[in-house]
Amino acid sequence: MSLWYIIVAFVFFSSMIIVRIIRKTKKNLPPGPPRLPIIGNLHQLGSKPHRSMFKLSETYGPLMSLKFGSVSTVVASTPETVKEVLKTFDVECCSRPNMTYPARVTYNLKDLCFSPYSKYWREVRKMTVVELYTAKRVQSFQHTRKEEVAALVDFIKQAASLEKPVNLNKKLMKLSGSVICRVAFGINLQGSKLENTYEEVIQGTVELVGSFAAADYFPVVGRIIDRITGLHSKCEKLFKAMDAFFDQSIKHHLEDEIIKDDIIDLLLKMERGETTLGEFQLTRDHTKGILANILNAGIDTSAQVMTWVMTYLISNPRVLKKAQAEVREVIKHKDDIIEEDIERLQYLKMVIKETFRINPLVPLLIPREASKDVKIGGYNIPKKTWIHVNIWAIHRNPNVWKDPEAFIPERFMDSQIDYKGLNFELLPFGSGRRICPGIGMGMALVHLTLINLLYRFDWKLPEGMKVADVDLEESYGLVCPKKIPLQLIPVLTQWT
């Protein structure tokens, strides 16, 4: 009798698989791995989905189908397929799915990063490009960046005189937070509602919005699962901390009679109708939603770029020596280091590009959603399909990059490849309509800080550590930080 049940079960499940294959063939969907009932391919993601998807793409191709619970997904993993998604069919593929926790922390999708493609999104995008992140505005905040970098240099000098290690993760996060608080919110990080929790709130939020939440994939029971796992309560805690900070910043602006020229001031003018946002009247939630993007993306991305650059430099002594020699030759004994000095530092620019390549800031771009049926790479992508762009896979692909696991800045020598979204071999900030609008603002701080760190100090590992001991593993989130903090000992030099 038991044998009979086994035969029936075998025939039943075999029939299901055959039917699925036939249906899939008729739909002409991209190939993909077999799925489990209910959960689909979620079990194959692991703790680092960008790496898992890259591994799967080596078997199933540059455009593959996955199923996450009830959500149909495709993953693009090569420059060719990604170019189709981000350029050829940018309009059809640039909307966003409604994701539970990003919606919560952006005041119901009133932001730029997570809101769907719409007239409102186009107006906010236009406002950020024309008003917030212009070259003129970036330049206007140079004095603030110089002051905060000078404060960091003073701290490192004290640590160097005592031969004490510096936690660069923490110090660079604080630097970035201090700059963003001043240029965007008009207040100092020290003394603000986020003074003691900014690191937890920023990194927690970035990790939260990059997570694969049950509520997004299981409409009926997902929210219950997230309450059991604690994801829901974590979201509420982070949201309340951010909201209190925004209230404090806005109150400060409303009570201060001194006219400011920062980002909150512009948004408050739009609330009052003094400046327009097309046909839309901004509410307080719109203001906070836009500020949420600036706070989280602005602080975390710049800090992580600088941390990863210093990580790869200390783990590659040859590269560190070459980069420092260039910086010291160009800067010489000039006290007034400026951001524009980066234009004469060709090797340092190569180091930054190589860091973007080997550790892209956002290894999986924020999911997109097809707004209509579209054909990509010869396959049909139905409307409402989620589209993941795996930047990690492109940057580590041996068919795209020679020796992709090695850190070799010289690969960019005499190369026109840049990171501004036009070269699909290197896309740390994305491309197309959804490209990060704050590249100029973030990179200005990155350049100024790295030049100072390399010019003024030598760096060595803590006692007992060797170069081989430097950990290069990333944690997973929307932005992938270094898993183990980078501790380095600064050394005073004649340039300090």
From Swiss-Prot:
Report the SUPFAM superfamilies cross-referenced here: Cytochrome P450
Q: Which InterPro entries match?
A: Cyt_P450, Cyt_P450_CS, Cyt_P450_E_grp-I, Cyt_P450_sf
Record carries keyword Lipid biosynthesis: no
For this protein, what is the EC number? 1.14.-.-
As cofactor, the record names: heme
Q: Which GO terms describe its molecular function?
A: heme binding; iron ion binding; monooxygenase activity; oxidoreductase activity, acting on paired donors, with incorporation or reduction of molecular oxygen
Which sites bind heme?
C436
Q: What is this protein called?
A: Cytochrome P450 71B12
Q: Which organism is it from?
A: Arabidopsis thaliana
